[in-house]
Amino acid sequence: MTGMNTVPLSDNPARFPGEAASFPLTGPTGKLETLTDLADRPGARAGTVVICHPNPVQGGTMHNKVVTVLERSLRESGLDTVRFNFRGTGESGGSYDDGRGESDDLAAVVAWVRQVRPDDALWLAGFSFGSYVTIRNATKLGARALVSIAPPVGRWSMDGDTLPDCPWLVVMGEEDEVVDPQAVFDWIGGIRPRPELVRMPETGHFFHRRLMDLRGAVKHAIRPWLPPARETEAGG
């Protein structure tokens, strides 16, 4: 699948679409603009990943370049993918809620995934603010693995949240100009079990000129965690 051309569908599909698709899901404060895509068959794994985008107040959407590359790396690894716009972003209803309402948005999307893919391993992934939302909800939502790109340590408090104990990858640019890299490294050092950390030298927050390196780093790191081969047909 290319992930580039999508077929528009009606609200709340009763099955996971059998081709790249766009559709609204019912969220807590209105519709949530959603995109899905399929891993290539054969080679698909029995897992679906929900991917969250950076801060909408600063222009973040599910079409962000880092989110797009993250989606591609996970799909090429065999996972079917779900992206959506948080409330108040793109065609999604509602307004920004500093991570609280966005957590409810994520829960609504995950509930749909659980309905249409009840036997799949659920993965979560996010970039920047999207990492914050997925980290704080991974345990509650039963994520089997988590991928966090440039988690915004120091910009949003993660103290008191139940940190994930599933396989967890963190990728951080060593020259991030938005999130303090050392704060992230220190935070990770205090987590048990410790996430797998990939430090990318000469790399800023948006991975300019390093997006293909990010893609490769994610694919390499998650390979041992991938679920078994998918036995059902696409869209099943």
Give the positions of each predicted feature:
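N-terminal cap/lid segment of alpha/beta-hydrolase-fold proteins
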Residues: 2-47
